[in-house]
Amino acid sequence: MIVNLTEDGSSKKMKFHPNHYLVMKLKSHLISQYAIYRNLDDNTIRRKIKLCDEFINVFSKIDSGDSTDWWAITMYEKIRAEMVLDQRILDSGGISMKEFLDNVRKSIEVWKKIMTILSIEPEGSYLRKIASQTKQEISKAQDLLLMAQFF
């Protein structure tokens, strides 16, 4: 990966291995920065999902398992991005309602795991706030599934 080292766009560039610590740190920051979905186009959301996958793939080699806080936070970001993208694809006719609802059901299962992992964090901490937001996401998704039964 080539990383531009200056903000002014000059040509001072260095090559890093895609799994280098600094590259992974950059990916982590990009994942966080791609948070306001209404401002993002579909390709940027896809990029965020890809960054999440890359981050999980590399860090799972260092700190294996899917019960770690870094896994939970990254999966939270990934699932939210996937849901936004799925909604847009559904709206444009790219997937069926059945496929969309299947994806919602899968997301709920992952969100439940995320909430379990992060709910043990100290009250008032950033991770505990994400657990609370995850609970809200689960509730919204379950409401969506209930409403879909009437259509």
Language model feature labels by segment:
Residues 1-151:
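Extended alpha-helical scaffold/coiled-coil
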